[in-house]
Design a protein with these regions (language model features):
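Hydrophobic packing and interface segments
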Residues: 1-735
Length: 735
């Protein structure tokens, strides 16, 4: 049938993405790495990055082993869980780790080649950096969809059809597939937190001793922490960001598929149910094809200005977005999904919310606009006012993204439900579809994102290898472009986490249905005396059954705990960076003291020691925050039951979302306020205002690169853990 033919688009698109990723990687490897000095520096960075990843995967491996044993006991011993969970969990984690690894490997090979290309022209530098970033983007979407289509085909073949309720089968398939999202989430959390602590310990350490105390510029080869700093860009911004978005991407598609299956559970219409399940996968598949077109369209003139560069990247992204809108209408019409026009509009809503969040992030954090320029000016009265203004700016900047998400939630709910607030099943499906729409162009948005650290490293390479001022000027242009795109990318990651979190929250109820069925609960006795069969219960029925109202103390307790989790998690990651940076500062000072001739350039600093300190610090510090995130939903479920978990997830989602935007934007603005001064405003480099903004930038580092981004994962991971543990919560909760 037409539907099954359309479904094959999904695996085909994913394989195509991987082929193009391989092609771009090959093209990049053909380019020259430049002078012997450049090659040497690139090799040192690559070695540091790989040794860090090896360590990180060891720790993640141990955690995964523990969790798999736990899941196996629950699945095969107590039968409170689906038998596929332990295996699905492992594949999710494996593919998430693989995409980070491949993206990072490409990035570490691309930086010297980008610097070398910038010796010839700006355009060739842009092309190499951007296409190497595209490897990351395409690997993430390719592996994500490959994993999804593989599991769908496998489960569809082995799960028997249910003769009584034929619509039940797809519900079981989609809820089982959701669990591999937890594998992706767990791996992503370690990548984000570990990478974030690593990169910022090195960055803060290098800045404090180098810029502030010794007065040497950034990326100066005399600074012992420079190699660690450049390794950190790859570890945090490439591997961490990739794993984060891999998880949002899979999470949104899987949650929406589960909601689609649920929306049709009490009609006998298996055909329409199948259409609703594959629609999000198809939108993602088409998004991949159009991202590839967008990637090829990015190029610029030789004597391009900053505006031209931004324009060419924006052109590629906008082209993909416009094409995806047209293609969505086409694909959903071909699919003949009920209400296809309005559901296609929900995709547009998701894309628009993403664009609004990106634009507002740019406005608040780019040095071309007033907020960041005013922030630089506040440096005239010293560092304290820079900190005060930056925190104020970050808090104010939450308004537009939050309002955008609220409008997006209401609009997509109404569009999909046929403008009927009581049609909850389809309405929630619409919210999921909006999340999928927002992430449909991930292939290219992630390419512009991974481009940032590659350009940053190219600049570091050019500086350390002593290439001319002309080359530095070009790599600086590429780099500051990267900062703007990275800020937009962060906004995107946070916005998608919020919508994905909502969709996951809704699919949690689906898991509860499956959990109750597995326990043999055939009927639900409602508080008002009615009896509803578990198989046919609606979302509203479950809310009544568990008495999920705002006045229920269990819901309220859960909400307070969820809000606290966001702050607790931020506090742990901020302190971790502070401690690790402290070790780094001590080490850099020791080297300046003990190794004679570093500052005159006669002796080479011990770069390896600094890399080792960052690696050790990140390892020590990443375990506790991650375990807390995994244990909180389990503990809440065992004590307060389903009702408490729903409260926890809502509290964590709402607080975590706003807190993440605040931290990302405050950090980005502090960073660019310092850049604005370095461009020669308010006295330029080395002046008093510059010193004040460097302090702001240093505080902003863990804000924007550790705590802020980790919150996106916390939001999704808590929902994922709740989903995987639903059977346990239903079976054994205290209250």
């Amino acid at each position: 049938s037409m539907d099954s033919i359309l479904f094959w688009l999904v695996p085909v698109a994913s394989v195509l993405a991987l082929c193009f990723a391989y092609y771009f990687h090959k093209q990049m490897m053909k380019e020259s790495e430049g002078t012997p000095q450049m090659i040497k520096i690139a090799a040192a960075v690559r070695k540091g990055a790989m040794s860090y990843l090896k360590q990180q995967y060891k720790i993640v491996g141990c955690v995964f082993l523990g969790l798999v044993i736990l899941f196996s006991i629950m699945a095969y011993g107590f039968h409170v869980q689906n038998a596929w969970v332990p295996i699905a969990f492992l594949t999710g984690g494996f593919f998430s780790g693989l995409s980070g690894f491949l993206g990072m490997k490409t990035a570490t090979y691309a930086s010297a080649r980008t610097a070398n290309a910038a010796r010839n022209s700006l355009n060739s530098g842009l092309r190499i950096a951007f296409r190497s970033g595209a490897v990351m983007g395409l690997v993430v979407v390719g592996l994500g969809l490959l994993d999804i289509s593989f599991w769908y085909l496998l489960l569809n073949a082995v799960i028997p059809a249910d003769a009584l309720t034929p619509t039940h089968k797809l519900c079981v398939i989609t809820t089982t597939m959701l669990t591999f999202g937890m594998g992706a989430s767990t791996q992503a959390l370690f990548a984000r937190v570990g990478g974030g602590i690593y990169t910022k310990a090195a960055d803060v350490g290098a800045d404090l001793v180098g810029k502030v105390e010794a007065g040497i510029p950034e990326d100066d080869p005399r600074n012992p922490a420079t190699i660690a700093d450049n390794v950190g860009d790859n570890v945090g911004d490439v591997a961490g960001m990739g794993a984060d978005l891999y998880e949002s991407y899979c999470g949104s598609i899987l949650a929406t598929a589960a909601l689609g299956a649920a929306a049709f559970i009490h009609s006998a219409d298996t055909v329409m149910q199948f259409k609703a399940v594959i629609a999000p996968m198809l939108i993602a598949a088409v998004g991949i094809l159009l991202s590839i077109i967008g990637i090829f369209s990015v190029r610029t003139k030789e004597n391009a200005t900053m505006k031209d560069l931004l324009g060419s990247l924006a052109f590629g992204t906008n082209l993909s977005s416009v094409l995806i809108v047209a293609a969505t209408f086409l694909i959903l019409w071909l699919l003949q999904l009920d209400n296809w026009i309005w559901i296609s509009c929900a995709v547009v809503v998701g894309l628009l919310v993403g664009i609004v969040i990106g634009r507002s992030t740019e406005y608040y954090t780019s040095q071309s606009y007033r907020p960041t320029q005013k922030l630089s000016e506040s440096g005239k009265t010293g560092p304290a006012t820079v900190i005060i203004s930056g925190i104020g700016l970050g808090m104010l900047s939450t308004a537009i993204p939050v309002i955008a998400v609220v409008v997006g939630i209401i609009a997509s709910f109404l569009l999909a439900s046929g403008f009927d607030f009581s049609n909850v099943g389809m309405g929630l499906y619409g919210i999921g579809i909006a999340a999928v729409g927002m992430l449909s162009t991930l292939g290219i948005t992630l390419a512009t994102d991974a481009y940032g650290p590659i350009a940053d490293n190219a600049g570091g390479n050019a500086e350390m290898a002593g290439l001319g001022a002309e080359v530095r000027k070009r790599t600086d242009a590429l780099d500051s472009l990267g900062n703007t795109t990275a800020a937009t990318g962060k906004g995107f990651a946070i916005g998608s986490a919020a919508l994905t979190g909502l969709a996951l929250l809704a699919s949690y109820i689906e898991e509860i249905r499956i959990g109750l069925t597995r326990l043999g609960t055939v009927d639900l006795s409602m508080p008002n005396g009615d009896v509803v069969s578990t198989a046919n219960a609606t979302f509203v029925d479950f809310m009544n059954y568990y008495d999920v109202t705002l006045m229920n103390p269990k819901v309220l307790s859960g909400m307070f705990l969820g809000s606290m989790m966001a702050f607790l998690f931020c506090g742990l990651t901020m302190n971790a960076v502070g401690r690790a940076a402290g070790h780094m500062v001590d080490e850099v000072r020791r080297q300046f003291r003990e190794i004679k001739g570093i500052l005159t350039g006669e002796a080479e600093p011990d770069y390896e020691r600094c890399v080792a300190i960052s690696t050790k610090g990140a390892q020590r510090e990443m375990v506790i925050p991650s375990l807390i995130a995994i244990l909180a939903p389990i503990a809440t479920g065992l004590i307060f039951g389903v009702t408490g978990v729903l409260g926890l997830l809502i509290g964590g989602l709402s607080t975590g979302f706003v807190l993440a935007i605040f931290m990302a934007n405050a950090g980005g603005a502090w960073d660019n306020a310092k850049k604005y001064v370095e461009e020669g405003n308010f006295g330029g480099k080395g002046g008093e205002v510059h010193k004040a903004t460097v302090v702001g930038d240093t505080v902003g580092d863990p804000f924007k690169d550790t705590s802020g981004p980790s919150l996106n994962i916390l939001i999704k991971l808590m929902s994922m853990v709740a989903i995987v543990m639903a059977g346990l919560t239903v079976a054994w909760s205290l209250f």
